[in-house]
Amino acid sequence: MVEETAEFPIDSEVSNSTEADDDDDDFAGDHSPPLDMLVETSGAIYDALTLIGLLEAVDKPGEFEIHTFAYLSCLLHIYDGHPASSWGYSFSAVPPALPFSATLSSTLENLLSMGLLTRSHDESASPTEGSIEVLADSHSAIRLELTAAGKQEQKFLSSLEVMRHREKYLKAAGSTSLVYSVPAVVNSLVYEPQLWQAARTVGARKLLVAISSRPLYDQFEALKDALGRDAHHLSVPATVYVGYLEESARGDFNPSDQTE
């Protein structure tokens, strides 16, 4: 088993209070350029633009898919040895078992109002199958896409040194959609230990809090043992981890039991 001081440093500050995330709601009405917005939302701006750009090449994503791939990116950030609190914004689990960030949600709305994103309704879309079909019924047909201005802004943000450390996590998370479908990745993440535990509780629950993170530590430790601990492209552990979670989805068991 991994000690609490292991290389996956999720700490008690990881998941900020809901009040802290709610403070970001004021951001939704700000129409100033992205770089002039609050410092704590800059990562969310870059993440949203980058993930939409990556995923729209495969299948134009909806908002809840952006939240899920951003959460997967944060997990890879942790896998790479960084504390989740340094990701820049926190996540909560919302029923039935999806990761959600108030910061990211308000960022998407602001980018839409600024003309950096467009929102369309896909009449041909069918509800996502599996454990998230409740949300899929109302959201699966809503698609997000970068505008020309959005692509230009993403390119500019990518050139900034302060954003470059995020790029490899976003790209690795996005690469899983080339192996599995976007809905399959979303459904698989439901079996991530934090989300699995949240599905057994009532109401929203903060994610990546130290006291509940031992199963995630153990999964990542086992993954590093299997793949080797030398530096390697993060798309490999990302794809293997999603594949493991997909296997979990095919059976009815608690993924945290696999590490005991």
PLM segments and residue spans:
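Domain-edge interaction signal
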Residues: V2-E260
